[in-house]
Amino acid sequence: LVAINALNQDSPIESIVASSYQAVSGAGAGGPIELMNEVEALGLGQQIEPKVFQYQIAYNVIPQIGGEAFDGYTSEEMKLQNEGRKIMHLPELKVSCTCVRVPVVRSHSVSLVVRTREKISVERARQLIAAAPGCRLVDDLANKRYPMPLDTSDQDLVFVGRIRDDLTSENGLNIWCCGDQVRKGAATNACLLYTSPSPRDYAASR
């Protein structure tokens, strides 16, 4: 949450819409193993029964993390919403989340639509985020530079990019963040903490 907290210091945030793309290691050590086993089996033309996830995760995304909790939202989505309000000390903040499991070993990503009371320009948002402790701005679409899980794994920073005006709201910004959920927990960024070995550890063990 360090990235959006930097914006909140400049103009109070009124609402957040977040879509979280969570790595398989967020489900524990068995997540990456199941992903790799499925990739290997499918390469041989075989099918294996998923045990960690509800469905095959290889070459797939699963739009459910946790059980059904409230009015169509999952427990993970409610957790993310409630933690955001608590950490930012904004109990009335309007937050809506969708959490998706993706076939990435490590490092969660989140797409944000942040609406503030007063308009924050894209350039001002970049300045605020670049100066925020724990953040690294990687935002150069013309040169294909933006945060990706492959580049943010095993890093202590939250990487932020794709900052642009939201076309549905005068005071909205669209933001993309990536962070290693092992190194940076929910108390300091938009990712949820869950310890697991790194991709290199899994590769070396096979």
Regions found by a protein language model. Give the residues of each.
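A common structural junction motif
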Residues: 124, 129-139
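FAD-binding beta-loop-beta segment adjacent to the flavin cofactor pocket
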Residues: 148-170
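Short FAD-binding loop at a beta-strand-to-alpha-helix junction that anchors the flavin cofactor
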Residues: 173-177
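Flexible, small-/acidic-enriched active-site or ligand-binding loops
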Residues: 184, 192-193
